[in-house]
């Protein structure tokens, strides 16, 4: 047989070189539900392996030695990237700030907790220009101490040391941020170009999910909204974006003024002379970006953005000069050598040092967003108080900096190292330590029996336990069942938590708690937080037994009940779900995702895999977990029994599905022969039969031999959610 191919000339029919690649599935079907986020940063991408315990490694670190080396680094100027004013402090503060400053309260994502700044897209954001140099300057120290300190911790620690080395007393430092090993691929905005601002609607309404004003910025445009040098208008952007990072006005003023006490911005020349960002660079650039053709490209010729601003007379020393200059001068609009809008002190003497020539001086300069602290009425009051009371300013900046760099770490039980502050802060969502003997296995069995005899249904117990635990966000480690904050506002009043039912369940559980605790003589107690979870466990076991399957739901006591004064109700508002596919709930607030997308998003926040998401949803449907007790997705005639009926009936080809003509967002499943209505479901339900990957998972649980596996896998996923915030268990 002739081995030659017809018109290929014997050549391989697949393209090579030139960056060619075939189309991915999403190129063909861009509207396909993406569930890849459920499997990113798994142990498969972690080179350190499952057994590696970063918290333990950090505890063995000689922290004093690292800090000493960082102090030495600050003034060890390198020829390939010289230090401004002979000190890298300003650069390192910016690196740490921009590592933490991506945090957003909406979903808890972003922040310093995972060392994501070294990955795309953050490593190539315009606002992070030349921070690649800061990270390369740190490499010898990271290399020296290896796995005992993560990049994530090193970024934040370096920022602290930079401040300390310039005479500022920080509030403290906590280690414990384990590195991740691949980009998170978050939704940073709808724009397809850097600095795009299609995220606004109406009268400058910023997209609900986002925390910055333009693609590739951490917060705001320093030249003003869309480059308009209006300090008052800029203040509106500042207030909005900093609030979405959990900062109030005082913290915002302290952070801006404190951070801008040090260092400078870089706009020495034409920005068009800057080369590609790190991800767009050539192979030989080895991950360094923004190579500049302006002069030497570094030092006095450095270009990071547009403005060329030095705020204070002592840019490597803590001072009150920022406020002295802000209020001491009148300001006139100017342009940097790069053509950016900025402000200079009107009629001022040249008192600010040049970063590289000790014989030269400059006049003080400010950004439009700096002047916002004077010309916005609310900011002005705070700024003037800080100006007149430097000690208050220093304390406010220290606390705000600590909050900025630790906000996404979760509760203090996750903090590591000897520099952890002793003071409890309300934004840490404190929970009292265990101060009593915990219940025994015998007590647990007794409490389960009392709960099941209380008249509460499987549906009520499961719904309450899930409502309590599913507030957890793995992104910033907030929420969860520990603390039993579901009994406080705002959670007790959320529509998704069915307030009337919730009040009834909590009332009966509190009565059981009181009766049990009052009967103890040796100080043994059970918390309501534990009892809520135990009630769900008892209900799941009963539902499985009623379906003919024996299961034991693991339960570990040790949760405590938070006090109302330990709960910042306003800060918990962001945990309220707009939609919750696990409970077939769509709220009244604006939805910016399809219901099935919101389900995947929520599953990722709960740290669930696709199989765990699948089995958990299927189980909750038959257990009566829907909000409002509606029947959508309840594909069973055996409710409150832990069966695999959801999958069996969804996959049944005797049923034909169509969009309801009378109910929005509802699908009707009718008998193919008779047309009789069998079931109703939502997009969240039907996606498990429509999406090929999710259907494959559903088929595992819809098989004839699947009942036992289904029950066991449901229990495992359920327990994972119930224990998601039990960092005390992980620490043991």
From Swiss-Prot:
Alphabetic keyword roster: Heme, Hydrogen peroxide, Iron, Metal-binding, Oxidoreductase, Peroxidase
Cofactor note: Binds 1 heme b (iron(II)-protoporphyrin IX) group per dimer.
One GO CC annotation: cytosol
The keyword GTP-binding is assigned to this record: no
Reaction catalysed by this enzyme: H2O2 + AH2 = A + 2 H2O; 2 H2O2 = O2 + 2 H2O
Entry binding sites for heme b: 260
Cross-link for Tryptophyl-tyrosyl-methioninium (Trp-Tyr) (with M-245), residue positions: 97-219
Signal sequence coordinates: none
Subunit structure: Homodimer or homotetramer.
Name of this chain's protein: Catalase-peroxidase
Species per Swiss-Prot/TrEMBL record: Rhodopseudomonas palustris (strain BisB5)
Encoding gene (name): katG
